[in-house]
Design a protein with these regions (language model features):
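N-terminal core-binding DNA-recognition domain of tyrosine recombinases/integrases
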Residues: 6-100
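Intrinsically disordered, low-complexity and often Lys/Arg-enriched segments
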Residues: 1-2
Length: 101
């Protein structure tokens, strides 16, 4: 097992993701790596965007697309610490609550 995959599995475990979800996320990452024939940490945001567009254009099932998208978002945001616009920004609940007060 690569150190990167081990790190993602640790991150998913810390996040409380179910075993089945973890397996689905790892499988989605394998498909991405196989598609580009290189490690996902070496891919650009544009390459990941094109990959997701390709899934849509091929007409994969909605659930398959969502698992792929969520697994990529988890990997790039949580494991690698990359906040890409592709996945949108998450609102900071504390900042939102403070602004409302």
């Amino acid at each position: 097992m690569s150190p990167l995959r081990a790190r993602m599995i640790e991150d998913m475990s810390l996040a409380g993701l179910a075993d089945a979800t973890q397996k689905a996320y790892i499988q989605a990452m394998r498909r991405l790596a196989a598609h580009y024939r290189r490690s996902p940490d070496l891919l650009s945001e544009e390459e990941v965007r094109c990959y997701l567009l390709g899934l849509r254009q091929r007409g994969v099932a909605r659930g398959t697309f969502q698992i792929s998208r969520y697994s990529l978002r988890f990997f790039y945001y949580h494991t690698l610490g990359r906040a890409w616009a592709l996945f949108g920004e998450k609102k900071d609940r504390l900042a939102t609550a403070e602004a409302a007060a």
